[in-house]
Amino acid sequence: RAAYLSGGGFGAIGHSSFIMIPSILSLNIIKAAVMGWGGTQFLIYGSMDRREFIGRFLKRAGIGVGAGAAVTAGLVGYYQPRRELYSSGPRSADASQTMPEGKRCVVIGGGLAGISAALELAKKGACVTLVESSGALGGKLTGWEIEALGEQMPVEHGFHGFFDQYYNLNEMFASAGITDDVFDASPGYPVLFRERPAETYGQTPKVFPFNILSVVGQSRSLDIASFLREYRGLLPVVSMFGYQYGKTFREYDGINFMEYCRKGEILPAFIDTVLHPFADATMNRMEVLSAAEAIRYFHFYFMGSPEGLSFNITNRDCMTALINPLEVKLRELGVTVLSGHRALSLKVEGERIAGVAVQGAGGSGEILHVSPADVQDSGWTSLVSREGVPVLVKREGGGYLAFDARCTHMGCPVVPDESGGFFCPCHAGRFSSNGDVLGGPPPAALVRLSVKSGDGMLVLHSPEGGGGTAEKLLECDYCVMATDVRGTREIVGNSSLASPSFEKSVADLGEADPYAVYRIWLDKPIDSASFPFYTVSGYTYTDSISLYSAFQEPYISWAGKTGGCVVELHAYAIAPEDMRPEEEIKAAMIAEMHHMFLETEGVRVLHELFMIQSNFTRWAPGDHAGRPGVETPFSNLFLAGDWVRVEAPVFLMEAAAFTGRMAANAVFRSEGVEQVPLPIVPMDGIFA
C-alpha cells in the first residue's frame, strides 16, 4: 500500500483500488458538503452503512457537482480501519480452559493493569494475590472522599474520558457487570485557544476519509485549499496515516514531535488547532514527546481508529462507577486483595521468581544510615534511602526526630509545610507536626522512625511493635509486576536480580513532567460554558477544563442547591521553567480561567482542592528501544502497565488493560491454557 501527492492531485494505491482526486475543486466539494451537514448529522451518518452514506453525501452535494463528488466519494471504497485481534504468541489447538490446580500468581499493583491481569488469571482458576500499596485499588483512577462545605464529596486524580476503541478496558468493565448507565456520551470535543476563537469538533463519521474531512470542515481555521497550497506541510501529515510500528519507531523515535512538525513545515494552523492540543493529552509536552509515540498516539485515537472522535464520561465518580465493582468482581473470583501492603522486592531462584517480599504489620526494619553532619541544624532534612524510601529528619531536644515521609494514602513523598506539619502535594493530605492526619485521604498517621546512634552514625529503623512494618514472603509460581514506573524502579532496584540489562532498562524509565489538578467550588455558574469538558491550548498551565457540576453527581445536585458550580482546571505537564510555588500556580490558573470565561472575574472560590503529582509515563525521544516489554529474562515474571513496550497501537488506560491481559496470556501459554483474545485498532495506518 502506498500514497503519493502529485501536483494538485492526490493518489492512493491500496489492495486492488486506485482512487484519484484530480483537483482542489474536488476536495472543496467534499468540504462544502461536510460543512453543510453539521455536527448532529455527523453522529447519525457515522454509524450508517457505507453506501447509504455515499448516497446522502452525493444528494447533499447537489446535482451540479455530482460528477466531481462521485470521483472523490470513491475514496470510501479504499481500505477502512477495522477492529483486529492482536496475536500475542502461539496458540494451542488443544489448550485447556483452566489453569492447573494450585498455581499461585502474585500481581503487584492494583491499578488498571494489575486489575486486568488479576481478573483474567482468576477467571481461569489461578490462585491470585493482588498487592497494592495504597489503601484502595484503581491507580490513576482511584478516588477518595473529602469534606467540602459541610458535605462529603468524592474526588479523584482528574477528568478521564473513555473512548470507544478502549476495547480491552471496556471488556474488563463489562466483565465486572459495569453497564452503560454509568457513562454519558460527550456532546463534542471543544478546544479553547488563547489567541483565536474556539473550535468545536462534533461527533465525526467513522468512515475514511470523511472522518478526517469532517474535522477540517468543522474548523474555523483550517481548509483543504490551504493544505494543498502548503503541500510540503501536508506530506508529514499524510505520513502520520502511514503508521507502521517498526518503520515508524526506526525513523521517528529519535526526534521530538515539535521538531517533526517544524521540519516537515506542517501548516502552523494545523499544529495549533489539532496537533498541539491533542498531543498534550499524552501528558508529555510536544517538545519532549517522541515523534514516533505521537504518531502512534494519533493512529490509536483517530487516524487509524474505526470508532471516530467520540468518548464517554462517567456520571458518577470513578471509584463508585468503576473501581468498586471491579474489586467486588475480583473478590467474587477468589482473588486475595492486599491493599495497604507494599511490595518490597523479588526473591530470585535461578531464572525464576520464587516470591515477593511484602511489608505487613508488626515488625521492624532498618531503613537508613546517616551521618549526624548530614542533618541540618534547624528544620527538616530530606533524605532518601538506597531503596528509594523518603525520610524526614530533624534535631530536637538534644536528639533526633524522624518520619518515614511516604504518605499513608498512596505512598507519595510528603513535604514540610508552613504550619510546621506535613503536606502531600499529590492528593492534598495534611499531617500535624507529630505526623497525625489533619485532613485529606490518608487513612493513618505517618510512621515515626526510631533513631539510634552507633559508630558515629545515626541508624533509622521502623519502630518496634504494631506501628512498624514486617516483611513477609508471598511465594509464587508466577509474578506480574503492574506497578507504575516509580514503583517498578524501586522494586527492581531492591531485588538482587543479577540481570544487568533488564535492571538498566527499568532504571532508565522516567516520569513525565508534573501535572496539576485544581478543583474549585464557585459561588456562581459559568453560563457561557455549554460543554462539560474543554481542551485548552496556548496557556502556561491550563490544558483542560471540566465542569463537574454539569455531568457528575453529587456535583450536579450541589450546584442545583447552591446556584454555584464545580470546575476542575488541569495542567497536563508543567515545564521545569514554569514550576512555581503552589499559590502562584493556583493564581495563574484562576487568571487563565478568567481569560477563557470572562464572567468568572467576579466569582468567589468557596472551596478548593489542589494537587500536583508526577507519575505519568515519560515518552521521550530514544526511550522506546530500551523500554522493557511484557516478557522478562525470568521465565515467570511479566510486566504490565501503560509504560511497557508493546507492538500493538494502544495508549494510556487501554495500554494498561491490554498489557495486563498480555501478561495473563503469557502465563496461560506457559501452562497450555487458552489465551484471552486481544482486540485492537488496526496494526498499521491506512497508507502503511
Task: For each feature predicted by the language model, list its residue ranges.
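FAD-binding beta-loop-beta segment adjacent to the flavin cofactor pocket
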Residues: 557-561, 613-639, 643-647
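Mid-domain catalytic core of redox enzymes
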Residues: 341-364, 373, 469-565, 576-578, ...
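Helical element adjacent to the flavin cofactor pocket in flavoenzyme catalytic cores
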Residues: 300-363, 452, 464-474
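N-terminal pre-ligand scaffold of iron-sulfur
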Residues: 361-419, 445-468
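Extreme N-terminal leader/targeting segments of oxidoreductases
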Residues: 47-105, 123, 688
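N-terminal Rossmann-like FAD-binding beta1-loop-alpha1 element of flavoenzymes
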Residues: 103-130
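Mobile amphipathic helical/loop "lid" adjacent to a hydrophobic cofactor/ligand pocket
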Residues: 174-175, 180-295
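Glycine-rich FAD pyrophosphate-binding loop
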Residues: 122-145
